[in-house]
């Protein structure tokens, strides 16, 4: 199988194996970035030679500016691996990144929802409940 066909297979594999919804974006450097899950859980960057799998993460740079800072889980040189080995390894990396991300969620003591860490106001209180229960001002 030639490289362009394999590249398209990788795209199809990612779109069907990442947690939905999957947002696919072409980047200026020619790579394809996939951000999956709601809220975001896994970030995958696909280049002409490698697949980088990361756990979604980020920081609030200001009160209104959130900057994504994915945490790398693993990189695969997809041209060097046989198809079965590549897809098996990629599935494990995606599963690991998702599990790492979900393990950081916290349950809000007011509403009981499992909430991404960037949307927690304090330990145990999500931002939405903090606005309602404590009069937080933004």
Segments predicted by a language model, with ranges:
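Long, charged N-terminal interaction/targeting segments
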Residues: 1-89
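Cys/His-clustered metal-coordination modules, chiefly Zn-binding fingers
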Residues: 75-138
């Amino acid at each position: 199988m030639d490289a362009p066909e394999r590249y398209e297979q990788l795209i199809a594999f990612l779109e069907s194996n990442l947690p939905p919804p999957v947002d696919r974006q072409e980047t200026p450097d020619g790579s394809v970035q996939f951000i999956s899950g709601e809220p975001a859980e896994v970030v995958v960057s696909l280049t002409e030679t490698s697949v980088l799998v990361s756990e979604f993460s980020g920081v609030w740079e200001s009160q209104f500016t959130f900057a994504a800072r994915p945490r790398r889980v693993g990189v695969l040189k997809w041209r060097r691996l046989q198809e079965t080995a590549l897809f098996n390894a990629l599935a494990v990396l995606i599963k690991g990144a998702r599990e790492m991300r979900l393990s950081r969620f916290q349950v809000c003591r007011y509403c009981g929802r499992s909430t991404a860490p960037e949307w927690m106001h304090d330990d145990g209180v999500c931002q939405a409940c903090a606005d309602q229960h404590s009069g937080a001002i933004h």
